[in-house]
C-alpha cells in the first residue's frame, strides 16, 4: 500500500466533490509545515533553493496540502500554498471527530486514526496535527508508526482521510437509517476507543 498515488486519489476525489466550483468561496487558513534550504553545486558555485510543505484548510471540512520550490523562501511558500489549494478535498466530520477508525499509509509511515470524545483535543504529533486542525477536527486520537518524515506523515494522513465514509454512506451500506448509525457510533465507538490497545471497531455499526 505504501506505493499508492495519493495525488491521483486526491484529484479523483476533487472531481467527485466538484471542489473547483466552491474553492473561491472557501476561507482557507495556511500552515507552513517546513521550509528547507537545499544547495546545488555548479561550475559557478553553489546555488541555493528552498522547498516547502504547506497545509491549508477552512476548519469546516476542507483541507489540502502542497509543495513549493523556488530560489526565494517567500516564493516557495507561495507556490506551496497555491498547490495546496489545488489539492483541497472535503472530509467528513461527526461531532468534531472522524466518523470511524481508519489506518492511513504512505511509504514507511502508518497512522492510526480513531474517533475521540468531545474535549479530548487533537492528539497528534508532528506534521499530522495541523492537517486535522485545519480540516476542522477538534477531537481525534492518532498514532504514527514508522517514519516520521513530514512528507510521508502528511500523505499518510490524507490516505486516511480519503478512506473516511460519511454516516450517510455507512447507513446506505448497512441498510439502516442515518440516525441509527449515529446512535451506534456514539454508544459503542466513542467510549471504547483506545489508541494503546487498538483494534478495528467498524463492527460497531452491526451492533444493536
Curated annotation (Swiss-Prot):
PANTHER family: MITOCHONDRIAL RIBOSOMAL PROTEIN S5
Entry GO terms, CC: cytosolic small ribosomal subunit
Family from the record: Belongs to the universal ribosomal protein uS5 family.
Gene name of the encoded protein: rpsE
A Pfam short name: Ribosomal_S5
Physiological role: With S4 and S12 plays an important role in translational accuracy.
Domain comment as written in the entry: The N-terminal domain interacts with the head of the 30S subunit; the C-terminal domain interacts with the body and contacts protein S4. The interaction surface between S4 and S5 is involved in control of translational fidelity.
Domain annotation S5 DRBM: ranges: 28-91
GO terms of molecular function: rRNA binding; structural constituent of ribosome
Positions of transmembrane segments: none
Keyword Ribosomal protein: yes
Protein name: Small ribosomal subunit protein uS5
Gene Ontology biological-process entries: translation
Keyword match tRNA processing: no
Keyword annotations from UniProtKB, A to Z: Ribonucleoprotein, Ribosomal protein, RNA-binding, rRNA-binding
Subunit description: Part of the 30S ribosomal subunit. Contacts proteins S4 and S8.
PROSITE patterns in UniProt: RIBOSOMAL_S5, S5_DSRBD
Superkingdom: Bacteria
